[in-house]
C-alpha cells in the first residue's frame, strides 16, 4: 500500500514539475517549432479562406483524428507484442498487493468514475450549455458542436483501435481494452473545456493557461492511476489512452482554432 501511495505522489510531482518547466521556458522560441507552427497556421488560414470556417474545421478534424488513430495503432501493437515483459509483471504485482476492501480501494473506485462515458457525457452537456450562453454573440452553436465532436470522435476512435490492436483478454471481470477510454475521455473533455475557456477569455495570462492544462494532465494521471490500481486495464492501455486522448485533443484544438480570427490570405502571384 505504501508503494501505491508513493506512485501517486511521484506521478503528481512529475506532472506539476512538467507544468512548471513549460511555464519557465518558452518551447515555441525554438526556430523549428516556430516554423512548424507557422506552416500549420498558414494551412489553417488558407483552408478557412477556401472552405469557410465550418468547412475548414471539419477538414482539420477529420485529417487530424485519422492521424491520431494511425499513430496510436502501431503503439498498441508494440505494447501487445511486449505484454509479458511490461504489463504482466505490473498486473501480477498489483493483484498481490492491492487490498480490494480497504478505504483506499473505495476512494479509487469512486474517483475512477470521472472517466466513465456517462459521467463524461453529463459533464460535456453541462459545459456545452454554459459555453453556448457565453458565445451567444459569437455563435452559440460552436461550443456544443466542438464538445459533441470530441465525445463522438473519441468513442468511435477508441472502438476502432480496440478492434485493430486486439489486446488479449485476461478473464478478469470489467477489464478494459486498448486504449483506455476513461483516460482518453478525461484528456479530451477537460482539455477541450480548457481550450474553450481560452477562446472565451483570450487575455488569460500564461500562468493560468499553463496551470489549467496542468490540472487537465493531473486529472488524466489520476484516472490512469485508478484504472491500474483497480485492475481495470493493462498498464500500457492507460499509456495508450493518454496518447490517443492527447492526439485527439490536438485535433479538436486544431479544428476549434478555425473559428479564431485568421491572418489575411497571401496575395496571388
Model-identified regions with their sequence ranges:
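Membrane-interface loops
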Residues: 79-99, 104, 118, 122-214
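Membrane-embedded catalytic cores of phosphoryl/pyrophosphoryl-handling enzymes
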Residues: 2-8, 23-24, 28-31, 128, ...
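C-terminal ends of transmembrane alpha-helices
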Residues: 71-74, 155-169, 222-233
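N-terminal transmembrane-helix/juxtamembrane module of multi-pass inner/ER membrane proteins
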Residues: 1-119, 162-170
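Alpha-helical transmembrane segments of integral membrane proteins
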Residues: 6-10, 56-60, 64, 141-150, ...
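Hydrophobic, membrane-inserted alpha-helices
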Residues: 44-45, 104-109, 124-131, 219-224
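Alpha-helical membrane-inserting segments
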Residues: 71, 75, 157, 161, ...
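Hydrophobic, lipid-facing residues on alpha-helical transmembrane segments of integral membrane proteins
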Residues: 17, 63-66, 70, 145-160, ...
